[in-house]
Amino acid sequence: LRPIAPGSGVVGQLARRGHIPLGYYKDPDKSRATFVSLGGVRWALPGDLATVEADGSVQLLGRGSVCINTGGEKVFPEEVESVLKAHPAIFDALVVGVPDARWGERVVAVVQLRAGAALELGAAREFCREQLAAYKLPRELVRVTHLERTAAGKADYRWAKQTALASLAF
C-alpha cells in the first residue's frame, strides 16, 4: 500500500482502516485479498478505484471489474452514470461496454426514462459533453422500462450488458 499524492491524478485502490472485520466466513482466499496488514495496521481493500483531489477529497471512480476500455482509455461506468442521471428525462441509468471492432469496446447507456419523457442519443451526448471527455460519451442509448438491480440494490451490470447486446443485435 502506498498513499497517492493529492492532485496527482493517479488512480489507485481505495483502502480503509479502523473497525475492520476479521475476514469472510469460510473464505480465507477472499479474506487474504481483501484484508491486509501493513506496519501493524489492518486495512480493508473493498475493490473501489479512486483518485485524491488537490484539496484532499477522494473521487470514487468505481470498480475496476466493470471498467470499460475504449481505444486504450478507461471509462468508469459510475462516472458516466452520475452525469446521465442528472438529465431531467432520465430516471436511472447503467453504463456498460460492448464490443467494438475499432476501439475494443464502446460505451453504451442503458436508461430508464421518467414517465412521459423522451430522449434521443444526440441529446444525451450533448448533455454529457459538458462534463465528460468525448471518449466517455455514450455511443449507443438503450431504453428500458426498468433497470434491474441486485437484491442488495446494487447495479446489475451483467443484466445491463446482456440487455445492451440483445438490443444492439450482437
What are these regions (language model features)?
Residues 12, 16-17, 22-26, 33-34, ...:
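AMP-binding/adenylate-forming catalytic core of the ANL superfamily
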Residues 162-170:
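Acidic/polar alpha-helix N-cap and adjacent early helical turns
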Residues 5-6, 26-27, 156:
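Short, solvent-exposed helix-helix connector turns and helix-capping sites enriched
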Residues 141-144:
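General small-molecule cofactor/ligand-binding pocket signal
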Residues 1-10:
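Conserved adenylate-forming
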